[in-house]
């Protein structure tokens, strides 16, 4: 498999003002694999600590966090001399050694010549638990997410089609639209968790893919009880299990009352924040106006809550993997929730911070909106064949926007104000909008 984040890691290595790098993301997203690949391709030597498998190694950060002392300790522990430019030091599962996260600040300030990458999950939770502070401004950070559609295509179908998607060559891609639709149907069910994609690429067995997804869900749910305060664990489960139902509503706004009778926001805020810190849900806020920057218009009372991955969402919902054989049904099932989940994932992978807008009267809503080229770009997701974009036109007129995007199974079409981008190409929105 290939991950697009590899290019970011290579760029980090050659950066003159390089800082220690923190690769953060939920479990099972491929952080360890990617760092091992990066080390093997780019460095003569690698020294790796996994603080979950080697709890004794956490003593590296006992006492002084002086960088030279830590390097000397590493050399003694591993029996190797570290040459700064030739050696990559990997601190894996760094959340198990919160003072190790703090130590990155001092590596940046006192020993920037060393190439250090840390990887972990739920780090904010670990730091709060140990009363440590996050080294803001002292480290470089990269988010690790599940594989996107183009990475899935590369793993399952090979480089030529994946490269054509990245190039946004719409004339070339128009000739293989049926194949792209088939691959997208598979992606909605298989998702982008690397272990699941790898197994599917080898066997094309959807039942095995679902079995692996269930294992991942069980691992996530097991972590709830291991790391979160006992008082919120059951509430976390309620929020997590509610995702399919919340997204299957016509109005996908998250409703606390759907969790249990009489549920209120203040009862679930901590559990929701924990799930977000863990990286397995993502909040898309409502904005009161489609004006840049969107963060200035956030309405804190309204949001949609998306899952980490389309495949995981499908497994949570109990959706039969065989749905990929049933024409376009996978795109419209549960009122298009898998399709909207997919678009949210693709936007996040492109570094976007999606929001959504709905009018105060409720007569118009955009599924998403992103900051784009100094203005705002509203998006409507069309899972069905009905391509009418009334809400988009209302939004564009109300906020005097010159451009809006509809994404659907229809062919690419630029009509000036409205551009239709095929669902399988929405990851290239910057090139096409």
Give the positions of each predicted feature.
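Accessory nucleic acid-recognition modules appended to NTPase machines
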Residues: 198-371
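Short glycine-rich substrate-engagement loop in P-loop NTPases that contacts/grips substrate
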Residues: 53-85
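Structural recognition of the conserved hydrophobic beta-strand(s) that form the central parallel beta-sheet
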Residues: 90, 115-121, 143
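Conserved catalytic/switch belt of AAA+ P-loop NTPases
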Residues: 101-117, 124
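Conserved lysine of the Walker
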Residues: 31
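Hydrophobic positions on the alpha1 helix immediately C-terminal to the Walker A/P-loop
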Residues: 34, 38
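Pre-Walker A adenine-sensing motif
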Residues: 1-16
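Interdomain motor-coupling "hinge/lid" segment immediately C-terminal to the ATP-binding subdomain
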Residues: 129-248
